[in-house]
Amino acid sequence: MRGLVTAVRTLTVLPVPGKEAERFSSALFWFPVVGLFLGLLQAGAGYLAMLSGWPELAASMVLIAGVLLTRGMHADGFADMADGFFGGRDRESRLRIMKDPSVGSFGAIGLILLFLFKSIVLVKLLAFGLYPWIVSGVLLARLVQVALASMLPYARREGGTAAGFVEGAGIQHFVAAFLVALFILLLLMNGEMLPSGIGLSAAIAGAVLMSLLTIKKIGGVTGDVLGASSEFTEVLVWVSGVFLALCS
């Protein structure tokens, strides 16, 4: 269970007793489980806020819960990646910019657009009562983190925060996490193959797009890239849920 302790401490602000795993890569198996827990809390916040009959307020509560539960670290990674990828001219300058704790213009604009778009999509999900899709987005976002950590090299030669997860990870970690995530996803979707397949396809698309982009820009992944991939995947899965509802 040390892997679970490491996963919870890495992905959330929640204090948990116990010792962490000696190999951080062993925590990757638990990422979808932690994603399920986070998703349930965020969806629960949205459900309670929807009792007011105000979808916009409920969408804000979902986002606020997500930021508070994760220290906003994935959003921070998204901002850092936006600054580095669009502000740097070469691999080294991009990595240097991403390591800078300050937020630049690309990062600020990216965050504004990210949360604006998330809010719009969440309003629709909440109005339709699609709470399983909210949870699924958070769940699959953590699966994509495992996919990138397991299949791509670490970009920084000097190491970094996520190096322990990436350098010790292999395809077996992804396969195990994938099976766990798929089982949970099917439960959330009441065993229905169409919504499960669409949600999973959106997550796969997010993983592929992020992989192609980060390999082109910096030749691998960093902690910021893993965080950004989580944010990007949440959006894709939530959007796919809205489109499925509109087409039904």
From Swiss-Prot:
It is a multi-pass membrane protein. It comes from the Bacteria. InterPro entries: CobS. It is an enzyme of class 2 (transferase). Pathway: Cofactor biosynthesis; adenosylcobalamin biosynthesis; adenosylcobalamin from cob(II)yrinate a,c-diamide: step 7/7. PANTHER family: ADENOSYLCOBINAMIDE-GDP RIBAZOLETRANSFERASE (PTHR34148:SF1). Pfam families: CobS. Belongs to the CobS family. HAMAP family: CobS (MF_00719). GO terms for biological process: cobalamin biosynthetic process. Its EC number is 2.7.8.26. The chain crosses the membrane at residues 28-48, 103-123, 126-146, 169-189, 193-213, 225-245. GO terms for cellular component: plasma membrane. Keywords: Cell inner membrane, Cell membrane, Cobalamin biosynthesis, Magnesium, Membrane, Transferase, Transmembrane, Transmembrane helix. Its main location: membrane. One of its GO terms (molecular function) is cobalamin 5'-phosphate synthase activity. This is Adenosylcobinamide-GDP ribazoletransferase. Its cofactor is Mg(2+). It is found in: Cell inner membrane. It catalyses: alpha-ribazole + adenosylcob(III)inamide-GDP = adenosylcob(III)alamin + GMP + H(+); alpha-ribazole 5'-phosphate + adenosylcob(III)inamide-GDP = adenosylcob(III)alamin 5'-phosphate + GMP + H(+). Joins adenosylcobinamide-GDP and alpha-ribazole to generate adenosylcobalamin (Ado-cobalamin). Also synthesizes adenosylcobalamin 5'-phosphate from adenosylcobinamide-GDP and alpha-ribazole 5'-phosphate.
